[in-house]
Regions:
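Acidic donor-binding segment of Leloir-type glycosyltransferases
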Residues: 1-22
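Active-site acidic short loop of glycosyltransferases
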Residues: 10, 39-42, 55, 67-68, ...
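Catalytic donor/gating beta->alpha subdomain of glycosyltransferases that bind UDP-sugars
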Residues: 66, 72-96, 123-126, 130-173
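A recurrent flexible, glycine/aromatic-enriched loop bordering the glycosyltransferase active site
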Residues: 79-80, 100-119, 162-167
Length: 173
């Protein structure tokens, strides 16, 4: 009822429901699929709540990398510098994974992406039936999908300083 009331006032607010029989599916992939379906434009841009762009022109940098043949833009997300062995280990793992993703794509062998800084076309998502192959897996919304759909012709890397993100530190438990 509240959403209906708000949607009358805010014309850009959309809502839907999640059927009960989706309990064994990845909720993140289901939410992303619903958001992608509702998107009005073809170019989609993704990040995560614990990440922030370094500069103010992230959207312009990522969107500016598209040409007619490009369907995927891979961006980098660094781990925020913090003290402690755990954080250094996380930063190292993040850096090596990011370098592997970027170097593979730059050498015309793209195989993965990172949802913290990623863009792809809506039409690509639906042409490949979205997350259909991995909907029952709780991980892989970014890396498994990009592995399925990327190729040397449709994938670009954006590494300008405006396109780089930083991920906040993981909180110690």
């Amino acid at each position: 009822d509240v959403l209906k009331l708000f949607s009358n006032e805010y014309k850009n607010l959309y809502y839907t429901y999640v059927p009960v029989d989706t309990q064994y599916l990845s909720h993140k992939k289901l939410a992303l699929t619903m958001g992608i379906k509702a998107a009005r434009h073809d170019i989609l841009l993704f990040t995560e709540a614990d990440c922030r762009p370094i500069g103010p022109k992230w959207i312009k940098a990522m969107a500016g990398s598209y040409n007619p043949e490009t369907d995927i833009i891979l961006g980098f997300c660094a781990y925020r510098h913090t003290k402690g062995f755990l954080h250094k280990l996380i930063a190292y793992d993040n850096l090596t994974n990011g370098l592997q993703m970027i170097s593979s794509a730059l050498s015309h062998h793209p195989f993965t992406g990172n949802g913290r800084n990623l863009s792809y076309r809506k039409k690509l998502f639906f042409a490949h039936k979205g997350y259909a192959r991995s909907l029952n897996l709780h991980a892989g919304a970014d890396d498994l999908f990009i592995n399925e759909v990327s190729n040397p012709a449709n994938t670009q890397v954006q590494l300008s300083s405006d396109s780089i993100f930083k991920m906040n530190k993981v909180e110690d438990s």
